[in-house]
């Protein structure tokens, strides 16, 4: 424990306010009582800190009071933890409590806690009784060095953090570092971020201290706690020094600028952008972590503006990473904790607008000039455009318009040389200083991994210009965590060799992993070579790629090592560099053909010699190298040559723009093959090239005069082929022949960061450039640059730095601005490439976020192709054709493609070649389909396509890239029955039964599928006729076409019915009745009872069948809910894994909503969010205890904070103990809805809670008397809800009218009155017959006017009263429905036309989901109704519409009304040939002629002839309904048409108007029956 002599005092504002020490509880209590007399001391803390420290503080303080014989008392108050407590309500609660305790102006408040407690209690002190004294006792590192110092106090508001508060200095700040002992490691690191920030902007020496001691600090931090020991004992002096350095800086700045006049702004380095990220990512990502991201972004901004050197950004980034702090939103830590959150750029800029540093609308950011120094002594004004560029994922590149330009560009250090130098220096003895090091993602991954392996320590000198590597002589250890390498292929290959040298004990293994692209890049030949030499290496996922685990008892054995080197020279370099540390000298034999990129092998050997190891090439054996045992001896200094591959980009800019560029440090003496690019590629294309041993200058020819290269072998500079390709794209200056450039020798580029050859072909095509692949290269037809097309969807970069930089070059000559997606990928080799374009070349760059890169758009690509998998006989072909028809895609059967390719049927293929060979050919066809048809196709695959690992990987990667793999299935017994009748298919391999095959494949289908469709089954029969309808609903959700949630948001009120049946089949007889007035159906999965389940939990297939059956039985959206026992349901609380699989499956089933309880683990919730696709998540919580208060809503706010990270909808349900609980809930609803966009479902359960259900307007759960039971206590029916809302004035009675004459016999009044009665609405509907249209105006102005229908003769004349018209009203030139829209005091009358809806809805109901796309339709008659009929058929997808009328002239008049794409064909009944009549097959017919009109004989005969040619499922609608069954209906019925009468269309048209007025759907059957009566 500390005594007073061990306590360090730091002055601030002229007072010795800050006291720092270890274990100073006793000192604190004594010092307060001695120096700050009071009658009342109040310790305020939170419920996290209280159990750890409050009792000890109380007892020590009370003992001190007793010892001092002071007349004082100590009070304590504990509040809920978290940011939600930092609010007005909590401030008021504390103040009220203080008053009840008779606290007076001499009271001293002691804030014991983190930043929330300190800010809140400080603000209470600043305002209580106009200001009382307070003391800060911070318990987190973040609060110790930041929030507790300087007197800033405040609370949050709905519009932002800390917007209300005061400057109020504490009497003391007691920094007791003993609190850090119980602080979780992540929270300590959170505070270290602020310490790094302070050093980065104020003191380079402090920054160096942090740089050099990260490993020491983290080792102590991660050391397990031992009872009775202080975790940081071993580093007390270091820890104290670091904390004090930050405290002193802040105290110094605050003393100079207490009230934030300018200088104090500097303490906000990293905060302007960091706070914007925090507004979205908190609480999953902590304040310090967000500030770390903000620091990097603000440093990048300073670099972009030309103020901060690139190495300083790299140095800052390296320091942050060394403390396990995130440096971007793509950082693994952010992905781990908040992968479900997205940070839209415009939202970030919007948050940045609310910043106290800003000057009005001008944003001010702290700009670094160097590590430890800022650009100005206050925050600097920065434009939104520059901020937007830094924050944006993508970039728009403008055309380069300068006619002359002469620039010198120095590329960063070579990635190849940097990575090799890092390995050699780390493995060597002694210290080596590396200069011109590349600061990039790749080298950052390499350095971090080498440190984790214990290979070396790194530090910086010369302001970050020099990297000091202290090698450990090849001594390595198994790291504590896996080594994450992103997409750094060079690091992955080199480190695989290094990791093979690690001697592991007790089964410890080195694990190398990376991002999803790294996990498909090849490393197999290197692994094979190392395995053959005794290393134990396992693939953890895909064979031949990372992740790997490696273990070896004695490291590399040595001797002869054979390696295939035709794919990557990096395999060779990896073994070369680790070979000196093998147990025996190594003889490395390169086998399998000519090694690729020989110059890079030579580079490695030359560099090894510089570090003291000489490799000799055999003179007797080809491609064989001898490497002696030894250790690298580090040279004192090693300068890294600039990257020759990167140098090609500025030189290429000169070439295509006709300007001049010099690269001063790459010349003919370079070790790098790409240094030849200017001489071997650009000079033959027409450029003037000057190259010395150390520099290269290119002067481009006049714009547009570059020459193509007939053929060039780029095997010695393969990476530069991308640059050559974009230059060749505009090389069209030829005297004869085609302007084609052929590049060869680059086959290895297919297995780089991406398949670069295929990528170049694909992306150049977007510019309109004709290209194609060669066996080992590419050909490009040059194009006049003025004719380049704009890539409409942007250039996709494949996470490949060289793709991005190459296309940025071509963008400069494109006449229109070019979007390049994922600009950050250049950080791999040239992190500041965009800065060079902006500063050196003067190119205008604009930040952008494309649809293609916007994660909010869902994981499924627009128009993504769909691959169907599933058992033989599951219906893949049938369903595939249905999908293709509904989406207007093309359909392919992959089995048929295979048969065409091999020119024999499948059965013969298997008979001749065998099953294994057949599977390989099947795999090839699948791969070809995925490559050639990524969009716009539906493919049915063979049932066993998932049998091969390679095919399963193809399917899985297809899903990752945004494709859809749909598993199609039907009841297995039906499949067996179907296949027993089909003798054309080959028997299964080894005569397996269908049951055995499905049992084996079932897991694979689940592994590969992104979605799942199971055919609906009712009474053990597949309902084939319902598949089209069910599929249509399914596709709406999985392709993102559904707008259900958006529709709910725009409705005044919405409800959903809860189904709690054991089987959906039991609900079907009453389904229409019970869902009257509902907007959605909730399936309570916990109520379902699977008869085959042994544990009471329904199987995935059983639930899938239930969902499928429900989907084909209703038009309503489906909510999938599993309610646990603890939340008021039936599902076991301890079956989380089963619940997770069911909810994931619900997303694959295409359910509209999935209810996710907030009680599930964060891991489960994260997984659900990541896989939700277009399914919407309802995040829910039910307080069954009734103890949570809406008036003191801290628990509820914590749930809101958690839910808002994931939710599309938040559902919070309490338990009402009295009516007042509902009123408190409404106050909570009002507060929360003002501050968030996510819709809320809020209500209380129980008898007393029914009022809250009535007041809840969004998605209120309802019940129905016909259901077996209520799903929750207090549920009401739709009718009860509406009736109650009428009584409380929530729904006001309105009057509706029918305008026209004559209308006395209209059925509309009975239609609408019935609907109102059934739904409990108080409205009336009456016929308003009038002689003139002007008389209706007085009705339109009635205060209770709810709407009107309009019939003849006023459909046109009433339009003069309308303020706006719907598209349909404009199209028809008539209004039949008037909708009043009240916006405040203003009344807007909207005219609509629903005549067509009666026809459309009648057909939609009769078709039951069957599509009319690409079918023929017929309209009989050419009066006014015929227009609505034609319009409806076109909307239904009918591609050709025949029009038949007795008067031909009227038919042509109707045809002239419609655009040509309606494809209307007039039938002349007098002249139509009989063969034409017989060739027309109809699917839909509408008769619009009165039933009592006798048709001419020829017209009648033509109608009968046409009706005789009916397609399957044809629907006939006669708009006449007097009589109900007309003569034409009789003819159609005899010909087996599905007939509908005009009264049905009339009712459906009326209900369409009803829906427009009320937002509710009325029950058709009950209304129709009443109208008939």
Curated annotation (Swiss-Prot):
Gene: aro1
Keyword Amino-acid biosynthesis among record annotations: yes
Chain residue ranges for the region called 3-dehydroquinase: 1059-1280
EC number(s) from the headed UniProt entry: 4.2.3.4, 2.5.1.19, 2.7.1.71, 4.2.1.10
Sequence segments annotated as region (3-dehydroquinate synthase): 1-384
Positions annotated to bind 7-phospho-2-dehydro-3-deoxy-D-arabino-heptonate: 130, 146, 152, 162, 194-197, 250, 264-268, 271, 287, 356
Active site per the UniProt annotation: 260 (proton acceptor), 275 (proton acceptor), 825 (for epsp synthase activity), 1182 (proton acceptor), 1211 (schiff-base intermediate with substrate)
Role description: The AROM polypeptide catalyzes 5 consecutive enzymatic reactions in prechorismate polyaromatic amino acid biosynthesis.
Binding residues annotated for ATP, in chain numbering: 870-877
Pathway linked to the protein: Metabolic intermediate biosynthesis; chorismate biosynthesis; chorismate from D-erythrose 4-phosphate and phosphoenolpyruvate: step 2/7; Metabolic intermediate biosynthesis; chorismate biosynthesis; chorismate from D-erythrose 4-phosphate and phosphoenolpyruvate: step 3/7; Metabolic intermediate biosynthesis; chorismate biosynthesis; chorismate from D-erythrose 4-phosphate and phosphoenolpyruvate: step 4/7; Metabolic intermediate biosynthesis; chorismate biosynthesis; chorismate from D-erythrose 4-phosphate and phosphoenolpyruvate: step 5/7
Substrates-to-products reaction catalysed: 7-phospho-2-dehydro-3-deoxy-D-arabino-heptonate = 3-dehydroquinate + phosphate; 3-dehydroquinate = 3-dehydroshikimate + H2O; shikimate + NADP(+) = 3-dehydroshikimate + NADPH + H(+); shikimate + ATP = 3-phosphoshikimate + ADP + H(+)
MF-aspect GO terms: 3-dehydroquinate dehydratase activity; 3-dehydroquinate synthase activity; 3-phosphoshikimate 1-carboxyvinyltransferase activity; ATP binding; metal ion binding; shikimate 3-dehydrogenase (NADP+) activity; shikimate kinase activity
Keywords: Amino-acid biosynthesis, Aromatic amino acid biosynthesis, ATP-binding, Cytoplasm, Kinase, Lyase, Metal-binding, Multifunctional enzyme, NADP, Nucleotide-binding, Oxidoreductase, Transferase, Zinc
Protein name: Pentafunctional AROM polypeptide
Cofactor note: Binds 2 Zn(2+) ions per subunit.
Ranges for region Shikimate dehydrogenase: 1293-1573
Subunit structure, as described in the record: Homodimer.
Residue sites binding NAD(+) per the record: 46-48, 83-86, 114-116, 119, 139-140, 161, 179-182, 190
Family, as annotated: In the N-terminal section; belongs to the sugar phosphate cyclases superfamily. Dehydroquinate synthase family.
């Amino acid at each position: 424990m500390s005594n007073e002599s061990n306590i360090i005092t730091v002055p601030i504002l002229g007072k010795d306010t800050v006291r720092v020490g270890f274990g100073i509880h006793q000192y604190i209590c004594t010092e307060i009582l001695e120096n700050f007399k009071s009658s009342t001391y109040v310790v305020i803390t939170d419920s996290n800190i209280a159990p750890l420290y409050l009792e000890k503080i109380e007892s020590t303080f009370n003992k001190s009071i007793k010892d001092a014989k002071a007349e004082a008392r100590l009070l304590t108050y504990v509040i809920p933890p978290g940011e939600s407590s930092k609010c007005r309500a909590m401030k008021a609660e504390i103040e009220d409590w203080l008053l009840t305790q008779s606290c007076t102006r001499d009271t001293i408040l002691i804030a014991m806690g983190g930043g929330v407690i300190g800010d809140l209690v400080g603000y209470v002190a600043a305002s209580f009784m106009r200001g009382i004294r307070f003391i800060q006792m911070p318990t987190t590192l973040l609060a110790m060095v930041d929030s507790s110092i300087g007197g800033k106090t405040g609370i949050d508001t709905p519009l932002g953090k800390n917007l209300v508060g005061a400057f109020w200095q504490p009497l003391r700040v007691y920094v007791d570092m003993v609190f850090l002992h119980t602080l979780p490691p992540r929270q300590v690191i959170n505070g270290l971020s602020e310490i790094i920030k302070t050093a980065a902007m104020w003191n380079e020496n402090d920054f160096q201290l942090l740089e050099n001691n990260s490993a020491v600090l983290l080792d102590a931090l991660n050391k397990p706690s031992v009872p009775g020991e202080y975790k940081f004992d071993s580093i007390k002096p270091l820890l104290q020094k670091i904390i004090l350095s930050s405290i002193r800086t802040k105290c110094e700045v605050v003393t100079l600028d207490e009230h934030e006049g300018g200088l104090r702004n500097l303490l906000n380095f990293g905060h302007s952008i960091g706070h914007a990220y925090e507004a979205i990512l908190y609480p999953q990502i902590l304040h310090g972590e967000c500030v770390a991201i903000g620091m990097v972004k603000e440093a990048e901004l300073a670099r972009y503006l030309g103020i901060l050197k690139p190495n300083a950004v790299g140095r800052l980034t390296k320091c942050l990473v060394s403390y396990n702090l995130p440096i971007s939103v793509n950082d693994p830590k952010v992905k781990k904790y908040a992968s479900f959150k997205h940070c839209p750029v415009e939202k970030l800029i919007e948050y940045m607008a609310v910043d106290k540093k800003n000057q009005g609308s001008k944003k001010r950011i702290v700009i670094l000039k160097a590590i430890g120094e800022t650009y100005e002594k206050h925050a600097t004004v920065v434009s939104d455009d520059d901020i937007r560029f830094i924050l944006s994922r993508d970039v728009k590149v403008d055309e380069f318009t300068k006619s002359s330009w002469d620039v010198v560009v120095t590329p960063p250090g070579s990635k190849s040389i940097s990575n090799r130098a890092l390995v050699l220096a780390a493995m060597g003895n002694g210290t080596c200083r590396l200069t011109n090091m590349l600061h990039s993602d790749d080298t950052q991954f390499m350095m971090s991994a080498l440190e984790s392996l214990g290979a070396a320590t790194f530090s910086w000198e010369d302001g970050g210009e020099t990297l000091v590597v202290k090698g450990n002589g090849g001594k390595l250890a198994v790291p504590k965590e896996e080594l994450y390498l992103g997409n750094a292929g060079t690091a992955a290959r080199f480190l695989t060799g290094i990791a093979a040298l690690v001697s592991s004990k007790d089964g410890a293994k080195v694990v190398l992993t990376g991002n999803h692209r790294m996990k498909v890049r090849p490393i197999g030949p290197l692994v094979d070579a190392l395995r053959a030499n005794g290393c134990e290496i396992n693939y953890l996922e895909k064979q031949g790629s990372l992740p790997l685990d490696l273990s070896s008892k004695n490291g590399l054995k040595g001797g002869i090592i054979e390696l295939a080197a035709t794919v990557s020279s990096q395999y060779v370099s990896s073994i070369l560099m680790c070979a000196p540390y093998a147990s025996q000298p190594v003889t490395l034999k390169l086998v399998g053909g000519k090694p690729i990129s020989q110059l890079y092998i030579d580079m490695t050997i030359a560099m090894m010699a510089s570090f003291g190891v000489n490799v000799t090439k055999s003179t007797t054996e080809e491609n064989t190298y001898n490497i002696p045992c030894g250790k690298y001896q580090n040279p004192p200094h090693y300068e890294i040559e600039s990257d020759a591959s990167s140098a090609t980009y500025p030189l290429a800019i000169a070439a295509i723009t006709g300007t001049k560029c010099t690269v001063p440090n790459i010349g003919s003496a370079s070790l790098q093959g790409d240094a030849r690019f200017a001489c071997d590629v650009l000079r033959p294309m027409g450029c003037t090239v000057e190259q010395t041993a150390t520099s290269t200058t290119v002067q481009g020819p006049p714009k547009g005069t570059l020459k193509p290269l007939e053929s060039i072998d780029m095997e010695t500079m393969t990476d530069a082929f991308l640059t050559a390709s974009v230059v060749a794209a505009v090389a069209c200056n030829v005297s004869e022949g085609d302007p084609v450039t052929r590049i060869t020798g680059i086959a290895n580029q297919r297995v780089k960061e991406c398949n670069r050859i295929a990528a170049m072909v694909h992306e150049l095509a977007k510019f309109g450039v004709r290209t194609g692949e060669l066996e080992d290269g590419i050909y490009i037809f040059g194009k006049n640059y003025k004719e380049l097309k704009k890539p409409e969807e942007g250039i996709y970069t494949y996470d490949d730095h060289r793709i991005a930089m190459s296309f940025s070059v071509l963008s400069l000559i494109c006449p229109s601005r070019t979007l390049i997606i994922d600009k950050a990928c250049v950080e791999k080799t040239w992190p500041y490439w965009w800065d060079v374009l902006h500063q050196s070349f003067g190119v205008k760059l604009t930040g952008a976020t494309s649809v293609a890169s916007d994660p909010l758009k869902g994981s499924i690509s627009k128009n993504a192709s769909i691959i169907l998998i599933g058992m033989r006989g599951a219906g893949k072909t049938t369903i595939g054709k249905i999908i293709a028809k509904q989406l207007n895609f093309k359909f392919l059967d992959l089995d048929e493609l295979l048969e065409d390719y091999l020119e024999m049927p499948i059965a013969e293929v298997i008979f001749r070649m065998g099953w294994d060979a057949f599977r390989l050919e099947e795999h090839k066809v699948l791969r070809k389909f995925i490559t050639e048809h990524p969009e716009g196709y539906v493919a049915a695959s063979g049932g066993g396509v998932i049998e091969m690992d390679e095919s399963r990987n193809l399917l899985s990667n297809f899903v990752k890239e945004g494709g859809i793999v749909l598993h199609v299935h039907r009841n297995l017994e039906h499949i067996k029955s179907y296949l027993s009748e089909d003798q054309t298919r080959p028997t299964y391999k080894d005569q397996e039964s269908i049951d055995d095959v499905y049992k084996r494949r079932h897991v694979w289908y689940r592994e590969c599928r992104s979605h799942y469709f199971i055919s609906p089954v009712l009474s053990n029969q597949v309902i084939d006729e319902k598949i089209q309808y069910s599929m249509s609903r399914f596709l709406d959700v999985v392709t993102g076409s559904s707008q259900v949630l958006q529709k709910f948001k725009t409705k005044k009120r919405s409800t959903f019915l809860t189904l709690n049946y054991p089987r959906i089949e039991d609900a079907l007889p009453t389904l229409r009745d019970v869902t009257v007035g509902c907007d959605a159906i909730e399936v309570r999965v916990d109520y379902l009872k699977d008869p085959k389940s042994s544990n009471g939990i329904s199987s995935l297939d059983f639930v899938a069948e239930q969902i499928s059956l429900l989907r084909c039985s209703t038009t309503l959206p489906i909510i999938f809910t599993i309610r646990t026992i603890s939340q008021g349901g039936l599902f076991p609380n301890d079956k989380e894994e089963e619940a997770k699989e069911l909810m994931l499956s619900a997303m694959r089933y295409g359910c509209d909503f999935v209810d996710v309880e907030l009680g599930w683990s964060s891991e489960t919730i994260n997984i659900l969010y990541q896989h939700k696709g277009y399914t919407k998540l309802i995040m829910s919580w039910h307080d069954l205890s009734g103890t949570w208060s809406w008036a003191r809503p801290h628990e509820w706010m914590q749930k809101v904070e958690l839910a808002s990270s994931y939710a599309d909808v938040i559902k919070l349900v309490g338990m009402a103990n009295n009516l007042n609980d509902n009123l408190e809930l409404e106050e909570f609803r009002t507060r929360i809805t003002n501050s968030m966009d996510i819709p809320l479902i809020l209500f209380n359960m129980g008898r007393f809670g029914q009022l809250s259900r009535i007041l809840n307007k969004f998605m209120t759960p309802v019940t129905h008397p016909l259901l077996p039971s209520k799903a929750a206590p207090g549920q009401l029916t739709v009718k009860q809800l509406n009736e109650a809302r009428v009584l409380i004035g929530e729904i006001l009675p309105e009057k509706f009218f029918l305008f026209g004459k004559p209308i006395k016999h209209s059925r509309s009044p009975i239609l609408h009155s019935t609907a109102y009665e059934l739904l409990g609405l108080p409205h009336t509907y009456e016929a308003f017959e009038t002689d003139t249209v002007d008389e209706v105006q007085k009705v339109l102005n009635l205060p209770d006017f709810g709407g009107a229908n309009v019939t003849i003769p006023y459909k046109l004349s009433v339009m003069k009263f309308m303020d706006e018209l719907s598209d349909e009203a404009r199209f028809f030139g008539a209004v039949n429905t008037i909708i009043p829209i009240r916006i405040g005091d203003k009344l807007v009358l909207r005219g609509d036309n629903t005549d067509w809806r009666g026809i459309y809805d009648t057909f939609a109901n009769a078709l039951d989901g069957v599509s009319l796309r690409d079918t023929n339709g017929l309209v009989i008659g050419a009066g006014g109704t015929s227009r609505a009929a034609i319009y409806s058929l076109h909307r239904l997808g009918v591609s050709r519409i025949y029009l038949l009328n007795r008067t031909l002239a009227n038919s042509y008049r109707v045809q002239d009304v419609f655009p040509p794409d309606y494809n209307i064909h007039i039938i002349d009944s007098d002249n139509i040939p009989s063969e034409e009549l017989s060739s027309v097959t109809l699917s839909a017919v509408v008769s619009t002629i009165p039933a009592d009109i006798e048709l001419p004989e020829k017209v009648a005969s033509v109608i009968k002839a046409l009706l005789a040619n009916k397609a399957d499922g044809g629907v006939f609608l006669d708009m006449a309904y007097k009589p109900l069954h007309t003569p034409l209906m009789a003819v159609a019925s005899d010909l087996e048409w599905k007939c509908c009468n005009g009264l049905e269309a009339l009712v459906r048209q009326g209900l369409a108007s009803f829906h427009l007025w009320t937002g509710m759907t009325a029950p058709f059957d009950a209304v129709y029956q009443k109208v008939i009566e």
